[in-house]
Amino acid sequence: MAAAGARPVELGFAESAPAWRLRSEQFPSKVGGRPAWLGAAGLPGPQALACELCGRPLSFLLQVYAPLPGRPDAFHRCIFLFCCREQPCCAGLRVFRNQLPRKNDFYSYEPPSENPPPETGESVCLQLKSGAHLCRVCGCLGPKTCSRCHKAYYCSKEHQTLDWRLGHKQACAQPDHLDHIIPDHNFLFPEFEIVIETEDEIMPEVVEKEDYSEIIGSMGEALEEELDSMAKHESREDKIFQKFKTQIALEPEQILRYGRGIAPIWISGENIPQEKDIPDCPCGAKRILEFQVMPQLLNYLKADRLGKSIDWGILAVFTCAESCSLGTGYTEEFVWKQDVTDTP
């Protein structure tokens, strides 16, 4: 893994945004909803997006738009992270990278307009420019179709059954029933834009103990209680946890820390990966940290409405150091999950 350098760290914050800002043609970084796919061809299929623990479809968690300056083949580049929110595992994680040159088959050569489009509706995209159909429930590749109407597409039998139960059974036989009005399947996470800001450097001598207490006090009672609860599980790892608290103190609402090749900040001294734990890319290159997802994101997900809640301390996403060329396909990368407490 690469050592920390002088590169600035970019922080991500969850903010509400109009639906049009979160569509693929705007190249968004976002949490929840359906994926705003970058390349419209070569999407990961149902098997690639199935939980390795329980086998059920993963939920889209977030995507980060991260183009690489000086790389014509990665003028557009995005990382997509998926997780399992089903009981009993609530743990499965998979991450994919996709990149495109500026001149491609899917987007204009010129930057997108910053003005809202003329239409006012918030229709759901169910077919990409490549012709690929998307699942009505999750927005991932939908190779399966309703055997009755042949108009509704799904990624899996599970999602077809869910949609059937929540209204497709009644609507299926009606003409023109698939007008992009999709019921709430209670599967997607709440949707937010990820707004990026550069982290201000915090000099150690500036954060005195009395100031530190004031900073932590400004973090909000709920978050302070959450972190104090985490602290109860710490023993010899106190220094690591205190470093974590100090690092996030000035921006306690950060949900993401981005910086290719930087060192992650861990929440615990346990389950920190060694270099041998991070598999090389199939191209032969090492993988380096691209970004880490912070526990603060859990406050936005409302995941406990399904029963047992998903949980993590840190999700560290590692990608190919060379960002190897992919054409229009999606390549799986690696994510390391550090828990606050041991998972039963």
Curated annotation (Swiss-Prot):
Ubiquitinated by PRKN, promoting proteasomal degradation. The lineage of its organism: Eukaryota, Metazoa, Chordata, Craniata, Vertebrata. One of its GO terms (biological process) is regulation of hematopoietic progenitor cell differentiation. A zinc finger (MYND-type) spans 135-172. It is found in: Nucleus. The gene is PDCD2. It comes from Homo sapiens. This is Programmed cell death protein 2. Ubiquitous. GO terms for molecular function: DNA binding; enzyme binding; zinc ion binding.
